[in-house]
């Protein structure tokens, strides 16, 4: 893939953002004429503010982002090879790696310039939010999505691909934001003889790398799902097309349009495997299959006793989140739990303790809770993670030492539904603290009278006295007090 023939590196941006983003515009004029007008306008908005960028930023932020990106690519490749070996993904790894590098470069460069122009990460007018961690919007998703599809020759799948792209870009932006702010709140490395600052910066950069790898993997999954959906349904404007003849016609058209020959050859070879892969199946109306030939009538057989149906095996934590992440969560969680409470540690399998410890990390709960709330897609890997965490919670004794507390920020529409006498619940895991002083701040403070909460502080490594409730736990609103900017609730669990 050659999305941008002369796409600049982070070193180029560090030396001169203005000069190098102008080079991006020039490179587009040398090729990809069909994408010229769109990209020229897109990159012009990036380069408009680039003249002041380097002087405002300095080099350390870009260095940290560059390091996180470099660390993310091996994680991304390993996860792809493990999860998608059945469809020969290794054959197009160079194409996919180039794709995610260029998308990260576009998004990261946009954020860099936006930070200089707006004083906060991503302060640009074309869709990326003005605050760290804000979600990349439809504007940048549309423009970047069109560039990707034009370069690959996959414009036919645009409706399905672009619709899901902002979620992928949001995950990538989250990783870039984590690396960008890696040095916030710590002493400069040269002024900290203990080495603690260096360790904190490195931990944040590694976390950013894992977030970036996850966003890159989401991008590839979206591309594959868009291809499968197009082959099965056709373009949205044409309606749902179900016959095998139409699938064959669409397949031939798609392969004829593909600009990257390596990608086209891979698709031709693995199309049947793609269409049959369970993780790429689409929801909604399914294609109409050819009628099967009639079979000779069989004589009725004597009814036999039904055989018990084996429960399908849940994928391991390593299969769900990758070997590196799973091993780190399992080893860290087990080490902390064995030291803090060996008896409770012995109750949990490695997958269960790894999932619960992983949830207590920023990367864990920020990954799973939005999906449980329906804000991001819930993949089979996420479902496996939830299963291991729930099974681990079920083995632990309930917390019985009193009320727990939670501070959070809720939008007005959610708060308006939390009225005295009505039930309420969160589709995600619900984190609370046994210590009122350790509960997080926000516009809402809750006192929870729980029954099924489990103390997981013995495996977390954080001093938050965390008591965790499973997804969907239901509470009654016993009391509500609106006190200026803070609303206080008393919630009692419904047995």
Swiss-Prot record:
Residues 278-309 are annotated as: Disordered. Transmembrane segments: none annotated. Its EC number is 2.4.2.31. Toxic component of a contact-dependent interbacterial competition system (also called effector-immunity systems). Acts by ADP-ribosylating a number of target proteins in target cells; E.coli target proteins include FtsZ, EFTu, RNase E, Fis, YegQ, GuaB and IF2. It comes from Pseudomonas putida (strain GB-1). It is an enzyme of class 2 (transferase). Residues 344-495 are annotated as: ART domain. This is NAD(+)--protein-arginine ADP-ribosyltransferase Tre1. Keywords: Glycosyltransferase, Host cytoplasm, Nucleotidyltransferase, Secreted, Toxin, Transferase, Virulence. GO terms for cellular component: extracellular region; host cell cytoplasm. It is found in: Secreted; Host cytoplasm. InterPro entries: ART, Tre1-like_N. Gene3D superfamilies: Toxin ADP-ribosyltransferase, Chain A, domain 1 (3.90.176.10). GO terms for molecular function: NAD+-protein-arginine ADP-ribosyltransferase activity; nucleotidyltransferase activity; toxin activity. The gene is tre1.
